[in-house]
Each structure stands twice: as structure tokens, then as C-alpha cells.
Amino acid sequence: MTKKRHLFTSESVTEGHPDKICDQISDSILDAILSKDANARVACETTVTTGLVLVAGEITTSTYVDIPKIVRETIQGIGYTRAKYGFDAETCAVLTSIDEQSADIAMGVDQALEAREGQMTDAEIEAIGAGDQGLMFGFACNETQELMPLPISLAHKLARRLTEVRKNDTLSYLRPDGKTQVTVEYDENGKPVRVDTIVISTQHHPDVTWEEIDRDLKEHVIKAVVPAELIDGETKFFINPTGRFVIGGPQGDAGLTGRKIIVDTYGGYARHGGGAFSGKDATKVDRSAAYAARYVAKNIVAAGLAEKAEVQLAYAIGVAQPVSISVDTFGTGKVSEDVLVELVRNNFDLRPAGIIKMLDLRRPIYKQTAAYGHFGRTDVDLTWERTDKAAALKEQAGL
């Protein structure tokens, strides 16, 4: 079947978006706990609305952290520092409702089913059972240097740049809430050739004009991020298309942890298992196995075994070994997908304990992932973004 030129769109949001505030609070609490108790079990959910933060969840730990203090410091760091923003780090109410992890769940995580039934060797007995059932996807493609789809890559860079020009006072009239969206045109061979549409909505001071915002964002945000060769005379720009965005953040919309799972991953370009990341320690396969799946997919593409690769992992609660591993290369693979699955099994320990060890996940590294994407990051060193398995995969594949 002949391929046609087509458009694909992805979005991102700034760290001041209500849902992203929640993700950052949840991961800040997780990091604070892990910095004192690496083996803590954390499932921390946050909701924000006008003048209020609620933190709830299940946390089992030997340490103490000051949750209201962490919440206020996180909000202050994002930039909600004045009451007239409708949400302020100093004056917002902070409510907490924290329980311990269910003993029924802990029983499966503490000792994997294989260990309880005597199926594992002594060396494997410490393997952790999956904290839940579920399916997770990882993806990589050769559209960008970081092996991510171009639409989400550009959307994240625009969102990050929006925050940079606000915080460094290049555009001091900007406020923390904002969203970006990028539509990329692909040619008949599935290669990105141009940017068709850019949408940016940003919260701002009430006295600034739309014309000023339009001019400044094109000059200081879009030009600074999007390669000039991708923009042409047909590219469309929608800057604050409603004309005004003064009321924003939690005053404009309530926020919840885990409501930006497509922004967090591949911008809709790859499939998603449905599980969110933020506020969860690494025994939760929603997070750790999604990171592992990205690690696998990225190394497959970096090894030249495929131009794009999507990896699916699936787990049963309390069972260490994944119940399934599959790889889809969308017809771009240099070897069969059966061979790729075998290579994955031979080179990656995809039991929860194996993932935690392989990617060193018991560290306080998570707040930095809670805005601008968990994958394709070039500004921070994330273990699942490394391509240290690529050479071995290539050699074992006989390429």
C-alpha cells in the first residue's frame, strides 16, 4: 500500500500547568523519602485547586519527611509566589492523608511468587514481585538525535523555553501556566519534513497586549527552539488564540497527579499502557517497566537493528518475570522480531528487581522527570536514556 504524506501532532505543558504541579509535588515527596530510605514504598497522589493542595496515598517508610514544607518549596520553585496568581506557595492550604501500603500488596512485592514456590535460585530469591499487573510500552525512533518522535521533542523544547524566558526575565510578564503543541508533516517515506502548525498558550500579566506576546514568543521562544529549515511560508502559528490567558494554574483548573501520561511519554506517537509515573517508587512497574521498555527500544534503534521500535512488557502482581515481551519495528527491522525478543531476553533483566538494579532506580532522581517528559531528555543524565547495550545487541544480531 502506498504511503501518503500526513500530519502528526503532539503537545507539552509547562511546569506551572496544574497537572504538572501535582506531578512535581508527588515526585518531590518521593525523592525526599528515597534520599533517607532507599527501600521505601511510595504511592503519592496530589490534587491542587484554588488555594488548596491535597496529598494522599500509601507510603511505607522508616523515615520522616515534612510534606507541607516540600509542597510549598516545590510550588515556590515553579513560580507561584504571589497571591494575585490565585495560588501562592506561602498561603495555600496543604492537607495530607497518608496510609501504609496494603499488607496484601506488600506480601507479593516483598517476595516474588517464584521465590515463595521455590522456583528461583538463591541468587534470584531477592527478586521483587511486580507491584501490580499491567502492560507498559517503550518506544524509540531515529527522527531526532535523542531517538524520540519529532513532534513531542519540539513541543517539550518549546515548553521548557517558555519557562526559561519567564524565569530569566527575558519575558517578565509571563506567568507559570502554559501549553505548547506542534504539528509535523511527514513525507511518503514517513520522514518528518516540515513543521505545519505551532500552538502556544501562555499565562501572562493582564496589562500586556496580545500583539506583544505574539511578537515576543515568535522571537524568543519559537526561533530559539525550532530549526529554521523546518519552518516555511505555509507554517501556521497560533499564539494565545483565545486572545487572553490571565487566570491560570490551579485557579483556572484543578490539577491531579498522573493526568499528563501522553505528555510524559511519546506524545501519542506510540501506544501507552495507561499507568502514570509520578509519585511511584520503582517497585511499581507502571513506572520502572516503562523506563525499562524505553531503555530496550532505544538500544535497539541505537544499534541499527530498526529505524523505530516499540517494546511491550506485561506483568502479574507478585510475579517477578514479565508475562510477555513483544517488539514491533513497523517493518523497519534488520532482523526478525522473534530474534529481537530473544536478544531482549538475553541482554536485559526485566524482573522488577532486575530493572531496579540495571537502571539504579532507588535514588532521588524523579522530580527532574516530572516536567518536560521522562524520555529523550538531554539536560539530565537518566540511566534509561543510555545506549550502553547497543554494541552488544548489534554484535549478537550479526550486523
Swiss-Prot record:
Q: Tell me which cofactor or cofactors this protein depends on.
A: Mg(2+); K(+)
UniProt: Mg(2+) binding residues = 19
- Residues bound to K(+) are 45
Location of the region described as Flexible loop in the Swiss-Prot/TrEMBL record: 101-111
Q: In which pathway does it act?
A: Amino-acid biosynthesis; S-adenosyl-L-methionine biosynthesis; S-adenosyl-L-methionine from L-methionine: step 1/1
EC identifiers of the protein: 2.5.1.6
Q: Name one GO biological process term.
A: S-adenosylmethionine biosynthetic process
- Gene Ontology molecular function: any one: ATP binding
Question: Which InterPro entries does the annotation name?
Answer: ADOMET_SYNTHASE_CS (IPR022631), S-AdoMet_synt_C (IPR022630), S-AdoMet_synt_central (IPR022629), S-AdoMet_synt_N (IPR022628), S-AdoMet_synthetase (IPR002133), S-AdoMet_synthetase_sfam (IPR022636)
Q: Which residues bind L-methionine?
A: 58, 101, 253, 284
Protein residues bound to ATP? 17, 177-179, 244-245, 253, 259-260, 276, 280
Signal peptide interval: none
| Cofactor binding note of this UniProt entry | Binds 2 divalent ions per subunit. Binds 1 potassium ion per subunit.
Name the domain of life.
Answer: Bacteria
PROSITE patterns per record: ADOMET_SYNTHASE_1, ADOMET_SYNTHASE_2
Q: Where in or outside the cell is it found?
A: Cytoplasm
Q: Catalysed reaction per UniProt?
A: L-methionine + ATP + H2O = S-adenosyl-L-methionine + phosphate + diphosphate
Which family is this sequence assigned to?
Belongs to the AdoMet synthase family.
Record function comment: Catalyzes the formation of S-adenosylmethionine (AdoMet) from methionine and ATP. The overall synthetic reaction is composed of two sequential steps, AdoMet formation and the subsequent tripolyphosphate hydrolysis which occurs prior to release of AdoMet from the enzyme.
Spell out the subunit comment. Homotetramer; dimer of dimers.
Alphabetized NCBIfam families for the sequence:
metK
**By what name is this protein known?**
S-adenosylmethionine synthase
Q: Which organism is it from?
A: Bacillus cereus (strain AH187)
